[in-house]
Amino acid sequence: MAKLSRRLLLAGLAAPVVSRAARAAGVEIHVLSSGSFTAAYQRLAPEFERRSGHRLVSAFGASFGPAPDALPQRLGRGEPADVVLALEDALEALAGAGHLDAGSVTRLAETRVAFAVRTGAPKPDMSTVDAMRAALLAAPSIAYSPSGSGRFYETELVQRLGIAEQVMPKSRRWFPDRIGAVVARGDAAMGLQQISELLPIPGIEVIRIPEEVQKVSFASAALGGKARQPEAARQLMAFLSSPEAAPMIAATGLDPIRR
């Protein structure tokens, strides 16, 4: 059934987005992607390559933070980037640093955060704000990332819940590991990250949080400030933001922007 569903989704991407001439003159498009849109991008990339004739050269890292593979560090070293995929606030910061074309930012999907616990562990109730507060207070350890979701956790969520003093001493920022993997191997009892980043990780259960305290962000795309293939990059961005790509994006836990 999963293979059939995937074939049906790809069948929905049948309409061409580039001309035969463009396919014949394929180029390399360098893409930097943060975790929020990575699963969707990896599913859509082969179809774009097939239809366009271009080849995608991809690298991945966190939207923020000091890790060597984080997007700000990669761009600061001068790594090539025709297209950058990340949360919109990260793209704005990168544009402010001169790494991106600020006027090219294109929203692709809404993304939300969630907690995860190891498969087989007790699944705490987070159906209400009070229940979530109690679950975080009871958790022996909590993992979060240095990227956008982690910044939300340490600067907004626990502050709004009024439990920062109690939970931050038992919370740890992990990098470069994916938070779902940290939880799956038992290094933390609970972890917070974008839903789209948690869903591909085996060995965990995802727990959604109340919308009242949810962090709704935009997974977006932008042209690199020194893009070597700007026209091909725009073709990729048009493909990722097209209605035809929406079903595959939704299948990764994101809410596509409807156009």
Regions from the PLM with identified roles:
Residues A25-D69, G76-P80, D89, A93-G96, ...:
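Exported/periplasmic ABC-transporter solute-binding proteins
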Residues G98-G103:
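A short, gly/pro- and small-residue-rich
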Residues A2-A24:
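N-terminal export signals
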